[in-house]
Amino acid sequence: MIIKNVGFIGLGAMGSVMAPLIVKAGYNVFGYDIHINIAKSSGIKQIFNIKEFTNLDVIIFMLPNGKIVADVTDELLKNNVTSILIDMSSSDPRDTKELGQKLKIKDIKFLDAPVSGGVSRAKIGELMIMAGGHEDHIEIVQKLLSVMGKVQFAGPLGSGHAIKALNNYVSAAGLIASFEALATAISFGIKPENFLKIINGATGKNNTTEVKLDKFVISEKFNSGFALDLMVKDVSIADSLIKDLSADKPLSENVSSYLSKSLEKLGVNPDHTEVYKVLKKTT
C-alpha cells in the first residue's frame, strides 16, 4: 500500500509541530482542529468539517484522551471511512482495546502510537513512538511514522498506550524524588550546583536531574512546556493499570495522589515542574 494522503486531527501543542514534518516528507496532509486556524505556510490543507475526511489513506489522532478519539471515530464511521486509523494521543489502553474491537468488526485497521519526547523533540522528528497493534499493519505505516521519530513495536493493540502511561509514571516518580532530594539538600546547606554535579555523576541521576532541575527548577523558569494536568492524566491511567494488574503496588497511588493535590494547589494550567513549588513549602 502506498500512502499519499494523510489526515491529522488535533493540532495543539504536539500536533502542530508533528503534522508539518509529514508535509515536509512529501505527503499530502489534511488537518482538522476545532480550536485552531492552520497557517497556509505550514503546507497543511485545513478541513473545517469532519465529514470532509474522505479518501484518505491514513488518519492520525492527537487528541486529549481516548474518549474524544472514540467520539471522533464515530463521526468518521458515519462517512464510511476506510482509512488506517492511528491514535497518537495519550489514551487509556482499555479504551483503545474497546475501540479496536468495534473497528475490527468493520474491518478497519487501527493502531495506537503514542509518543514521548515533548514539543522540543517533536519539532526535530526525534520522538519515541510506541506502536501497538498488528505488526503487519504497523509495517504499512512504518515509513510515515518514522518521519516523526523512532518507531518501537510495543505489542498488541493498546500496548503503546499502556507503556506511555507507565513511562510517564516512572518519570513522575523520579521527578518527585528528585524535587524532594533537591529541596532537602538546599535546606541542609548544600548548593544546588554541587547537588546536581554529584547526583548526575552517581546512581541517582535520572531525566529530571539531568534535564529539568537546572533549566526549569533552579532557574525558577518552570517552563518545560509539559502541562501538569497531562502528567496527572497519564499517571492516573498508570495507577489504575497497576491496581488492576499488579500483585504489589507500593508507590503508584502515592505518586498519583501527590500530583493531583499539587494540581489543585497550583491553579490554572501549571507546568509540571511547578510541583517543586508545592514540595518546597512542605520540606
Regions found by a protein language model. Give the residues of each.
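NAD(P)+-binding Rossmann beta1-loop-alpha1 motif at the extreme N-terminus of oxidoreductases
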Residues: 1-51, 152
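N-terminal glycine-rich phosphate-binding loop for ADP-containing cofactors
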Residues: 9, 13, 17-21, 113, ...
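Hydrophobic beta-strand scaffold residues
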Residues: 29, 46, 110-111, 152, ...
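Rossmann-fold dinucleotide-binding core
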Residues: 63, 90-169
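Internal alpha-helical scaffold of NAD(P)-dependent oxidoreductase catalytic cores
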Residues: 102, 128-160, 172-207, 245-247
